[in-house]
Amino acid sequence: KISNKLEPWINGLGAGVVIAVLSFLTFELPLGAWLIFSFGSSALVVFVFYTSDFAQPKNIFLGHLLSICVGILINNILPVSPLSLGLAVGLAVALMAFFKITHPPAAANPLIAIFANVSNDFILFPIVAGSLTLIILSFLINKYLFKRNYPKKWF
């Protein structure tokens, strides 16, 4: 069991390792992007709130996937405006809640999709590849290094 005084530092270490690996894959290997800003918040969730439903693999993967798709869709049919940005985030939040795949960091993905004007390729890299890597690393670090019962359930 990790002591209460050490736990914040352990959580930070876990989150930092995940982001460092995703950064390495993005910047040091010719594989494409594996990292987006919202993964920083995801790393916080899987280490600080690892027992929460929001931190479970299904929510991470499907929340990010659904939210980026919503952002790309809205970006393709509406011009960038306060209305389109609000609609994209609101729709992503509603759909995550409806399908019980809420992952709060993923609510930023529609904004990323619209402001960066991403293509459909963004779905595979970084969303699918990065989410799966984040999930696998979080599992390995939480389960085997920190001896935590993570995840509660896979799907």
Residues covered by each model-derived region:
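Alpha-helical transmembrane segments and their membrane-interface boundaries
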Residues: K1-L65, C69, L73, I77-G86, ...
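Pore- and pathway-forming membrane helices of multi-pass small-molecule/ion transporters and channels
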Residues: W34-F49, V89-S119
